[in-house]
C-alpha cells in the first residue's frame, strides 16, 4: 500500500492496515520535521513531487521489499505540502512473522525511499 497525501498522516490507521494474524512484528518509522537541519533552524518544510512518478517509484520499492524479505504487509505514506515543526512527513510500516525481518525491511524502505523517490523538500 503506497500513498501520497496532502493530509495529516494517520499512522495508527496505517499500522492497523498492515497488521496480520500471520505477523508477530510490526515496525513503524515516522519521519518528522525537525527544528535543526545542518546547524540551521528550520521553521517549516514544503514537500513537492511529481505524483505519478513518485507513486510508481514507491510501488516499485514496495514490490522489491516483498521480493527480498518474507514480510506480511508494507505501507508507505508520504505527505506533500506545507509542514510545521513536529509534523509527520513520511510513514513506513512493515509487518512480518519476526521482528528482525521487519526492522531490516523497514530500514531498507526508508533509506531507499529517501534516495530514489522524487519527493523534494524546501525550507
Model-derived regions: residue spans:
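N-terminal, polar/charged subdomain of small-to-medium soluble alpha/beta proteins
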Residues: 1-90, 95-123
